[in-house]
């Protein structure tokens, strides 16, 4: 898509003259006026030019009448302060495009020949309380002012107790392979798609409630979600976004005293828990299972219609009239999925339930259940206690990604000619090489390496092996490699600052000095200034803080007592994972995990 560069030059401001409240600038391509808030930074010396570069896509210009600050961020003055002013578009794209379940009664059943069922959320019986929200999602994606969170209509909306004009709540029908076997119809058993919102940047977001009541796809469930799993979904998706991972987003966390009974560890001991609702967003909630159920049921016309829709709206780089568009679609998903999983591996993230019904066709991370981040580096780490065989362990994620791609190929096969079907295994075979290339690209960055050399794979593999042997912390080892100077690393990490606890663990390995020598030689002749740049590169990609299970558990336990301070504080800290934050350090978030962290168990129960 074309991009336009708008350069505003020759705005002369004298510091001796009082700045006007707003500088008006005319957008040269669309003849619309936008405004820039004046600050002292905008008061330049005499004859000094102020140059501002603004980029906008062809149909995504700056919003007329909106106010922007010097960082090109839209002022809060232009946001909606009431949900009565905010609304979904009059055209509900999904509702108007696809056949909808003709049965309006809300009862569990097998559904045929549709993509969605129309069904309303079930209001909470007890008072809904908004306990946390993401301001970046609220203002940046949904154009809402923070003050709206203090209003009853907003809380009722995000709780599923009411819905707004233009909303047609839908539950999506899909299937999926769960733990390797076909499970038939699954679908949104406790989620309601409220509508599609197009924000002022031209971005399209689908808003979905999770934990909002029964649907035709609830199977044996009650349609609700408990507080502990909802806290994890809310914090997990936002933490992943700030780590630079493609992911769904979370707007809000609502809690109620509605009693929910769950057998958390499937041991025959159910207990009562609080209900919670998360409002989450994604450009699309279609997943591999969305296509699988149509292919399995031989609903080929509907399958073709759905894939064409997804290509048209989410893969615009593909010619929607091309006879080979389905192969191009599959190839793009192969590429993006390989990168997504390489990104997971690079931050020590294990999803926990990589079923095809939890795997986005847009290759974004969705459905945060029993996920976890590595503490000590253990390739066999299994975050999900329900995963008895370790199918979804950290080290097997790339392999499972390939399995899921093959299931996607099976779902697309009915749309292809015989010669095209023969291309599927060839495209699939490229997944491994793409993943390996992306993996090495990311780990080179984690080590501050520039360019690519043959010994890089050995340097990375040797480091990971030493980390496994010494049970070194995955996140903090990489972070501290970016803290210590190369000169100090070459001498002896054990002589380094005592705060470098992860490197102290690593340095106990008998091969550490040999690895440090190879790593230093790979960096070539680094002078002090170049070494500082290496460390800066590393600190920009290696987080200081991640959502460790023990941190999430502490927030959940506080929330269970009605104290949501830890949830809010964690969100604030996780928004800046690459920065040093004294308040986080005071809580021990960059320290060695406590011993009791090893005993935390997370299951599929939610």
Regions found by a protein language model. Give the residues of each.
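Regulatory N- and C-terminal appendages and interdomain linkers associated
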Residues: 2-173, 179, 388-606
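Active-site-adjacent bridging/hinge elements
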Residues: 106-113, 205-216, 307, 311, ...
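Short, contiguous strand/loop micro-motifs
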Residues: 121-123, 222-224, 327-328
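Conserved ATP-binding subdomain of kinase catalytic cores across diverse folds
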Residues: 127-131, 135-319, 361-366, 374, ...
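ATP-dependent phospho-/nucleotidyl transfer catalytic cores
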Residues: 229-230, 260-263, 267-351, 362-465
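Hydrophobic residue at the +6 position relative to the catalytic HRD Asp in the kinase catalytic loop
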Residues: 354-359
